[in-house]
């Protein structure tokens, strides 16, 4: 056993933010017995070898859990009665067991038995104050420590991946997120290549993941890629929630074969599984069968026949032992007594079993981890630096700037491989622009032309926001990837939000130029290049704020239909109270507050000011004052006579060429007098920044990945 500093593994909750990762920490040991790889020089990378482990293993890890209980309070929704009744549901009831390195512990049971809940409890995904009982690794409590995130991995049931990245690229990005920055890129690539072979993905290495519209890898390969992402750092503890779900028997068996090799490399593998085949049962080392949160069997699959035989329900020959067991449990659950007798029998049977004989020495956690790293676990880089205490272990492998760059690079690479989506977005905006251009073709400087300009601006600015709603399903899909990756601190939430905002800017700029170029001159807007430049800027700002509000809503409400409903409703209210349908002066006092938080108000007022702020432009001359009134249909001669009559009454000579209303007069009539066009631009940009901050907070506090 290598000598380990006593300071190495203090698993307290303290620590600095910019300190090395665990892989950089655990490097003060004798590494001479480790397998060397071609061209390997210090600093070195420890590469996981998934070949079958030797029979004698000198570094055991023992994950023990005792008397785990977890209850949730069920409150009735929309209960307006005075009686505030709440029922308590038990999800886990006094569960005890253990899992060892080199073995696969499988948790079985029917739907609602508590399989996923037990996996979550062992993986630290249940709030500490809600879970009763203890979980220890080699006798030390690590459930809520930062150490658990460093030495463990959790593979979710969903296989959501970026569809246009290849298998190799997906794993390479995972290595950039999870492996130490000090590790050379060549070593990270070597780790990825090794993992591809170990997962049996060599033939699919350069194949894109794929989705509904793009052919990609098979379901089994996709599941193995998901596992590979989470084991890129070669964790000691590996938790999987139904890794064989949705796979055929062959692919399911191949996945469990991979998990068996991972276990034999020195990992503790714990997974839930619904109904394993006979071949899969042969790969499992220990079973825990649950029924309504209670343990009805805990032991080796080999002992399952004798267990049920002793219970009085012998398993017939050539019968799948777990299928039979689950059928018996399902039958008992439907009886009046339930599984009470089986639970009590299991408790007595456990007490009568002799303790497992083992030649493995019980060692402390710090010694076990240090020796495990020396054998190649926890992929890391070594340098000649002095040993660093566990108190300085960093939660993240990269600084924020590096995380932002990696996230942006991955997003852009996936995005540029979907030219049809890029073209569709730009095409939609251009078609909308061309439609508006033909409807509002070359508007003149008449009262009708002024009114039609306002209609064009109202519809055009609202289009900017509604076009952003297509981002809702895209982000909701990405949200699950974000949750999985941030569960074990692949990157900071702030880095994700910043990169998400930055990569959207070029897209929004292209959309802004496309819309501005197709409408500015065709509609007949004034002001020349300077006015066109500002027109592009305010459209860009409108797209930015629209994209931000949509991103925030989709981060807050992870349901596509509900997000659409909230977004459309909010934008409709913004349009109603933004100043086009009703002037600010006529909005009721109890709704005036919404006028000022309307996202549409500021870009709408900005383009109006940009168009009408020139006092030399006249929009109502002489007889045009009668347009839109009952006198509009009278003869021109009569209108001139009416002007003469008005001149006498007002004491001012009004002729056919007299300007009666300029652009600023129209702005005043619309109640647009409080802000300049540049104020409107900055406020629109600030709204976008505000909603990005809310998006960050919604992810930070709403994506804890823990049961309460």
Curated annotation (Swiss-Prot):
The gene is ABCG18. This is ABC transporter G family member 18. ATP binds at residues 109-116. The lineage of its organism: Eukaryota, Viridiplantae, Streptophyta, Embryophyta, Tracheophyta. SUPFAM superfamilies: P-loop containing nucleoside triphosphate hydrolases. GO terms for cellular component: membrane. It is a multi-pass membrane protein. It is found in: Membrane. Keywords: ATP-binding, Membrane, Nucleotide-binding, Transmembrane, Transmembrane helix, Transport. GO terms for molecular function: ABC-type transporter activity; ATP binding; ATP hydrolysis activity. Residues 75-317 form the ABC transporter domain. InterPro entries: AAA+_ATPase, ABC2_TM, ABC_transporter-like_ATP-bd, ABC_transporter-like_CS, ABCG_transporters, P-loop_NTPase. It comes from Arabidopsis thaliana (Mouse-ear cress). Coiled coil: none annotated.
